[in-house]
């Protein structure tokens, strides 16, 4: 699998509010996947945000390796998957990070203001892309 940086056409795919799935590892090594939102924060870091009470947060604290697969919302046969580590876990006390992600996806701040949130950034180690939209346009 290629290492970063990702090519410009894949960064463009990641800049859009596409559907995606994140995989974490349970302590017994079993992978767990869940749909999530993300935001390409810089060209090599992806922001994700979790409810502070979610079990996957415990898994990430024990083993920060994750995989994120982003599907092109216009053609789900096109996708990019990144494997890396979820780093810099921080409490999102003022909900600024989840609001940035929510505005990206739904156009307004995150509606549930009563539960704690935690932000983390995926540092990409490897990536893989597939499908017509994963190839550079000539």
Q: Where on the chain are the PLM-derived regions?
A:
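Extreme N-terminal tail/first-helix region
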Residues: 1-17
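Charged, gly/pro-rich active-site loop segments
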Residues: 1-5, 77-138
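Short beta-strand segments
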Residues: 17-52, 67-70, 81-82
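A short beta-turn/loop motif at secondary-structure boundaries
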Residues: 28-30, 73-76, 114
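Ligand-binding loop in jelly-roll beta-barrel domains
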Residues: 63-64
């Amino acid at each position: 699998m290629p290492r970063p940086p990702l090519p410009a056409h894949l960064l463009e795919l990641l800049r859009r509010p596409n559907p995606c799935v994140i995989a974490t590892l349970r302590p017994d090594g079993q992978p767990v996947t869940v749909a999530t939102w993300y935001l390409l924060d810089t060209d090599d870091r992806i922001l994700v945000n979790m409810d502070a009470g979610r079990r996957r947060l415990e898994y990430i604290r024990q083993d920060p390796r994750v995989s994120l697969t982003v599907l092109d919302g216009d053609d789900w046969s096109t996708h990019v998957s990144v494997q890396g580590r979820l780093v810099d876990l921080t409490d999102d006390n003022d909900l600024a990070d989840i609001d940035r992600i929510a505005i990206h996806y739904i156009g307004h701040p995150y509606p549930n203001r009563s539960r704690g949130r935690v932000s983390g950034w995926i540092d990409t180690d490897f990536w893989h892309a597939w499908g017509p939209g994963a190839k550079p346009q000539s």
